[in-house]
Amino acid sequence: MSSLRQSEIKRKTNETDISVFINLDGNGISEIETGVPFLDHMLHQISSHGLFDLKIKAIGDTYIDDHHTNEDVGIALGKAFSKALGERKGISRFGHFFAPLDEALVQVTLDCSGRPHLSYDLQLKAPRIGNYDTELVKEFFIAFVNSSGITLHINQIRGSNSHHIVEACFKAFSRAMRMATEIDLRRSDSIPSSKGMLENQ
């Protein structure tokens, strides 16, 4: 198993130009600039609470709306996670966390299985948080799941303030990802699967 679990992804389309660097064994240091302020705020949560060092730079067609940038950042970040995990040797594989933020409580459970699936249950009453379309929260996670190959369940236990709910979601996600991607010393160099492999299908 490589001692450096980090990766860099560059993704350029006619709509966006994105670069992502991640170090899974970092200290929660981040430099993030996507042109979508609320998305930046949520990505900082992933870095800070997951203890992932994260650099993201995105230039997109936000003069139209934030959809392409939001989705493509999710794709690039998911690919970066998958690449940094490599064969996924020695990882804990499963992660879960309950995160509260005032009246909001969100549960995230995930499996770095190589089997992309999203179950998403956030009830966001506000159509926007600042200028950010709340429909884009689900779109971000769809993109991340499909490119990273994880199974992800997001459940809102309670909450009324949309900002609190979304931020609790990202905090729970970051802690669950931290748990799942950490090395289990008892596994050493083995892949945590009875099949002997975990691949992004």
Swiss-Prot record:
Subcellular location, record wording: Cytoplasm
Catalytic activity: D-erythro-1-(imidazol-4-yl)glycerol 3-phosphate = 3-(imidazol-4-yl)-2-oxopropyl phosphate + H2O
GO molecular function terms listed in the Swiss-Prot or TrEMBL record: imidazoleglycerol-phosphate dehydratase activity
InterPro entries attached to this UniProt entry: IGPD_sf, ImidazoleglycerolP_deHydtase, ImidazoleglycerP_deHydtase_CS, Ribosomal_Su5_D2-typ_SF
SUPFAM superfamilies: Ribosomal protein S5 domain 2-like (SSF54211)
Parts forming coiled coils: none
Listed EC numbers: 4.2.1.19
Transcription regulation as UniProt keyword: no
Keywords from the UniProt entry: Amino-acid biosynthesis, Cytoplasm, Histidine biosynthesis, Lyase
Recorded metabolic or biological pathway in which this protein acts: Amino-acid biosynthesis; L-histidine biosynthesis; L-histidine from 5-phospho-alpha-D-ribose 1-diphosphate: step 6/9
Pfam family, one: IGPD
Gene3D superfamilies in the record: Imidazole glycerol phosphate dehydratase, domain 1 (3.30.230.40)
Family: Belongs to the imidazoleglycerol-phosphate dehydratase family.
Protein name, entry field: Imidazoleglycerol-phosphate dehydratase
Origin organism lineage: Bacteria, Bacillati, Cyanobacteriota, Cyanophyceae, Synechococcales
Gene from which this protein is expressed: hisB
